[in-house]
A protein has these predicted regions:
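Long hydrophobic alpha-helical segments that form multi-pass transmembrane helix bundles
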Residues: 23, 196-200
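Soluble catalytic domains of membrane acyltransferases
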Residues: 3, 14, 34-191, 199-200
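Extreme N-terminal tail/first-helix region
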Residues: 1-37
C-alpha cells in the first residue's frame, strides 16, 4: 500500500506539481513509516473547504503535513507563522501553498484570506486551530470565522503519532455556535496522540 496517493482528492483540488515533488512526498512519508488515510469526495468539487490540522505540538507536524501535501499533490493554501518562512525554506513553503502570517495581527490575516478565497472557485485552506505548538485550553475561532466568510465546510485532519497516520476525517458542518463547534471538534481529536502529549 502506498503511503499516499493523489487519487485521495478530486482532480480539481490537485496542483499538478512535477512528478518528482509528488514522489518526494510519498518517499518521505514511507521512509518515516507514515501513511495518509481517508479522502475528499467528488461531491466537494468547486467548493471551498477549510482543512484543520491537529494535534499541533511539534515542528514534525509541519514536515509531515508538507510531505502529505506533496504526496496528495494538493492545491492548498496553508497558514503558518512568518518566522518559519525564512531563507530558502520560505520559498519552498510558499511554492507548496504556505502563507506567512504575523501573529500580532491575526485579524488582518483572516480578512485577507477571506477576500482572496472568495475570488477563487473551489479552494482548500489548511489551518492549525490551536494557533501554536504550546498547550492551549480552547482553540482560536479564526478557522471558524474563515469558514463562515467563504461559506466552507471543514475537513478535520489528524496527525496521530501512535499509529503514524494522517487521517482526512469526515466533513464537519459548522453550526454557527463557535463555542459548541470548537468543543465538538476538540472532543473528536481526543483519540489522537500528539508528538508531545503533555502540550495537547
Amino acid at each position: 500500500m502506498q503511503s499516499v496517493s493523489p487519487n485521495q482528492i478530486p482532480q480539481s483540488f490537485r496542483a499538478n506539481r512535477p512528478n518528482f515533488v509528488q514522489w518526494l512526498g510519498r518517499s518521505l512519508l514511507s521512509f518515516l513509516g507514515w501513511k495518509v488515510l481517508g479522502e475528499i469526495g467528488e461531491e466537494h468539487i468547486n467548493k471551498n473547504l477549510v482543512v484543520i490540522v491537529a494535534p499541533h505540538t511539534s515542528n514534525w507536524d509541519g514536515i509531515l503535513g508538507v510531505a502529505a501535501i506533496a504526496g496528495l499533490d494538493a492545491r492548498i493554501s496553508f497558514i503558518g507563522k512568518d518566522t518559519a518562512f525564512k531563507y530558502g525554506l520560505g520559498a519552498f513553503l510558499k511554492y507548496m501553498g504556505g502563507i506567512p502570517i504575523d501573529r500580532s495581527n491575526p485579524g488582518g490575516v483572516i480578512n485577507d484570506a477571506i477576500e482572496k478565497i472568495k475570488k477563487m472557485n473551489g479552494t482548500l485552506l489548511g489551518v492549525a486551530p490551536e494557533g501554536t505548538r504550546s498547550k492551549v485550553e480552547a482553540w482560536k475561532t479564526g478557522f471558524l470565522r474563515i469558514a463562515e466568510g467563504i461559506d466552507a465546510k471543514i475537513i478535520p485532519a489528524s496527525i496521530d503519532f501512535a499509529t503514524k497516520e494522517i487521517l482526512l476525517g469526515k466533513v464537519f458542518v459548522p453550526s454557527g455556535d463557535n463555542k459548541k463547534d470548537i468543543r465538538d471538534l476538540q472532543d473528536y481529536y481526543k483519540v489522537f496522540t500528539a508528538r508531545h502529549p503533555e502540550k495537547y
